[in-house]
């Protein structure tokens, strides 16, 4: 029944997508972030739902007049440069066949990224897209939070297997990045005249925020816990009621400290001694050293996609790093695409973070709550990605590029943001 439900929704969306391709962007975002078909147990797990939606969206995009030109902003140029570099490094990759396959996968993400820029062309569509982002992972957080409470935190929270959030650490990062979307969603709902039906979303968002934070704790991810702390501090600082929010968080921490399991406390207790006692962490350090060695040998191209495997381990990695993925967005870019790849990636991440801050400050000064809220969401989500991604290989993840495009769209569609 679950399989029929998910596939039925996808198939029903296809004719709508051909007529209104921006709906396909919403469906694609839902499928790429939440991967609902991976929660099924039958034929839906391998059914090409994302591919069908992508094809319908692109066909509709070519035939519709309801679209805008690609905005002339610096992020678009940087994305094109990064995409071009991916193509160049693939031609000289250590492992050509896996590298070419990964280039195709990354290209699919970037094609849909540019389709999003073209098709989300007004304020309401932008809001609907943000709601889809928030709920796609907010529902995962709700499920994980309930699971954590019902089991007393005895078991770890995972995402659906075979997805970008299948691992507990990956799920923790995704949920941390989603917290600002959920936290600020009521403010966006109040700012738009969408009718009473949408009021439920504003009331449900705080509940989703709470359960999502609980789910992060339930992942047992040390990196996720550190990222959660960063996000909670940022949310408190950006809140209009800092004292109240800080008080609630202090109470939650005190209560939560008495509820967490001995296993969880022991796991978090290894953060300070990870380098000496944790073989997994030592393996990551070795993998990072291997990435640096590749960059020293091939500073302009790196080893290409999927460089960290096979004979490359023996040639470039210290013994403790062999057999490990690089587990870092920064060292992943450095090892696979050299110093140019890392520089472009940092420009995209850091430049967008700073632009979101400038946009937020100007909007607050001029009293534009909507733009201020979007700026805060983007900035905190990027901060979560920058912190949590330091120990995870998620440089090609859809979610990061969604954040960049969200900033581009806010800059393009909301005049106050564009003036900043």
Predicted regions located by residue number:
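Transmembrane signal-anchor hairpin modules in multi-pass inner-membrane enzymes, especially those
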Residues: 1-88, 97-101, 121-131, 136, ...
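Hydrophobic transmembrane alpha-helices and their immediate junctions
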Residues: 337-384, 402, 406, 412
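Hydrophobic alpha-helical transmembrane segments in integral membrane proteins
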Residues: 261-272
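Alpha-helical transmembrane segments of multi-pass inner-membrane proteins
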Residues: 8-17, 57, 80-91, 104-112, ...
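Membrane-interface micro-motifs in multi-pass membrane enzymes
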Residues: 1-3, 44-52, 101-102, 164-178, ...
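Transmembrane alpha-helices of multi-pass inner-membrane enzymes
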Residues: 55-60, 246, 250-251, 348-351, ...
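Membrane-interface helix caps and helix-loop-helix hairpins in membrane proteins
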Residues: 41-42, 92-100, 217-218, 390-394
